[in-house]
Amino acid sequence: MTTRRAFVQPAPELLALGGAIRHLRRERELSQEALAFAADIHPKHLSEIERANKDPRATTVVRLADALGITVAALYDLSEAHGDGKPPT
């Protein structure tokens, strides 16, 4: 017998944070592998964060911000400014 999991919509904050990280990564022309290496996390974990499937720890957010060359505050500001998870225009 298998149990089906109901689809749960990711929290808007996670969508926004993941979208901001993806936007900055692409803007800097970094692959997921390159950013993950620089932030000392697994590329699969970065993919999950960008897709809002994982809620990163504070230490992971700090490492990602450092690897992207911005402050954590700037990363959160960008995610708040574009809260829909889509790249800024």
Language-model regions, residue ranges each:
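Short, basic-rich loop-to-helix N-cap that marks the start of a DNA-contacting helix
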Residues: 53-66
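Short basic helix-loop element that most often maps to the first helix and adjoining turn
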Residues: 19-38, 63
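Residues in the helix-turn-helix
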Residues: 34, 45, 55, 74
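A short, Lys/Arg-rich alpha-helix, primarily the initiator
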Residues: 2-27
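Short, charged recognition helix plus adjacent turn
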Residues: 2-3, 66, 76-89
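Recognition helix of helix-turn-helix/homeodomain-like DNA-binding domains
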Residues: 40-54
